Design a protein with these regions (language model features):
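General secondary-structure edge motif
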Residues: 35, 75, 109, 121, ...
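Amphipathic alpha-helical transducer elements in NTP-driven molecular machines
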Residues: 35, 49-52, 65-71, 85-99, ...
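Conserved G1/Walker A P-loop phosphate-binding module
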Residues: 1-114, 130-132, 142-143, 148
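Flexible beta-alpha connector loops of hexameric P-loop NTPases
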Residues: 77-84, 118-133, 152-158, 212-213, ...
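Conserved nucleotide-binding/hydrolysis micro-motifs of P-loop NTPases
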Residues: 25, 51-52, 75-78, 106-112, ...
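Short, glycine/charged-enriched secondary-structure capping and boundary segments
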Residues: 22, 84-87, 116-119, 218-222, ...
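C-terminal-of-GTPase-core extension/linker across diverse P-loop GTPases
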Residues: 2-8, 13, 19, 147-354, ...
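Glycine-rich, flexible loop/turn motifs
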Residues: 26-34, 41-43, 51-54, 83, ...
């Protein structure tokens, strides 16, 4: 099951530098001119989780396999993208294929790095991109409402639901609000997601600050934090320059560097976890002598569907899941001890998997 987060931003905000650090590569050409990223660069990154190596140590696992997320560095956007200006059409098509948006905002002053509008204002930058996404959605909604007219005449239930949801989104957008702020009933949630509107995607604001502000943020990132809180969005503070340096160091050197900078952990780790949380994801583990592995599932997933992430046969032939909570596994010293202590539970098809569960599935082949 793949989860994809698109990294977006105006030209020269540091998003390609950030992508390079995330993926530990120089894949994205981080040049000081608009549109240096034309084709989206795609990178698969490990989700940091201190629980996994602890489980592996207890089980003496020969291999450790973390959960992963996909990040996509998408072409720099400019005002007018919804009308096809700059690389607008390509940008909008690429972002439509992602599950969430990491919006990099320039919160640093640097005379050597040009700003597309000539001055630094992260709130205005955020509004530029949000406006372009909203305009694109409005255009898309108008087209779709026209195309479903015939189905509506025939009383098609799906078309009736789609029209209702499209009009709900249209009302939000015409009021100047992104569609993700609309109140959608649980019964409509799947159909709402299927609309694939750009402004329904959850947003994480990434405040790219100067190196000296990486630990505490600055006045510009504080403004972004207020904006995010008002929108019910998430935000992280990060220095792409620092992360780029850390990406070139080994683990020991990186730890020393972070300590010198007054940072408890790499900003990228916080960014990845924030993206994971934004997408409503959680982790369960399978642990044994061969491997300890983290598996990604949406929150609220039931045991058979969680098993299906490993293999479809596990879901189809699901019998039960032997379950140990992470804290019990660690405090008691492994599967056998947890079982002896009565801390291993047998869960059926209705069980909602919890974050950190250590699971062993039994199924009919």
């Amino acid at each position: 099951m793949g989860f994809k987060m698109g990294i977006v931003g105006l030209p020269n905000v540091g998003k390609s530098t950030l992508f390079n650090a995330l993926t530990r590569t120089a894949a994205a050409q981080a040049a000081n001119f608009p549109f240096c990223t034309i084709e989206p660069n795609v990178g698969d990154v490990a989700v940091p989780d201190t629980r996994l190596p602890r489980l592996a140590g207890i089980a003496k696992s020969r291999q450790v396999i973390p959960a992963r997320m996909t990040f996509v560095d998408i072409a720099g956007l400019v005002q007018g993208a919804s009308r096809g200006e700059g690389l607008g059409n390509q940008f909008l098509a690429n972002i439509r294929e992602t599950d969430a948006i990491a919006h990099v905002l320039r919160c640093f002053e640097d005379g050597d790095v040009t700003h597309v509008d000539g001055h630094v204002d992260p709130i205005a930058d955020a509004e530029v991109i949000e406006t372009e996404l909203m305009l694109s959605d409005l255009e898309s909604i108008e087209r779709r409402l026209q195309t479903i007219t015939r189905k509506l005449r025939g009383g098609d239930k799906e078309a009736i639901q789609q029209e209702r949801l499209l009009k709900l989104a249209q009302e939000m957008l015409e009021a100047g609000k992104p569609a993700r702020l609309a109140e959608v009933a649980d019964d409509d949630r799947k159909a709402w997601t299927m609309l694939q509107l750009l402004t329904t995607k959850p947003v994480l604001y990434v405040c790219n600050v100067e190196e000296g502000a990486a630990a505490t943020g600055n006045a510009q990132s504080a403004r972004v934090a207020e904006m995010a809180a008002a929108q019910g969005a998430a935000h992280v503070v990060i220095s792409a320059r620092i992360e780029e340096e850390i990406a070139q160091l080994d683990a020991e050197e990186a730890a020393l560097f972070l300590d010198e900078m007054g940072l408890e952990e790499a900003g990228l780790d916080r960014l990845i976890r924030a993206g994971y949380d934004l997408l409503g994801l959680q982790t369960y583990f399978t642990v044994g002598p061969k491997e300890a592995r983290a598996w990604t599932i949406p929150r609220g997933t039931r045991a058979p569907q969680a098993a299906g992430v490993i293999h479809g046969d596990f879901e189809r032939g699901f019998i039960r899941a032997e379950t140990i909570a992470y804290d019990d596994y660690v405090s008691l010293g492994g599967e056998a001890a947890a079982k002896d202590a009565g801390r291993m539970r047998v869960e059926g098809k209705g069980y909602e998997v919890k974050d950190g569960d250590v699971l062993h599935f039994l199924f009919n082949a």
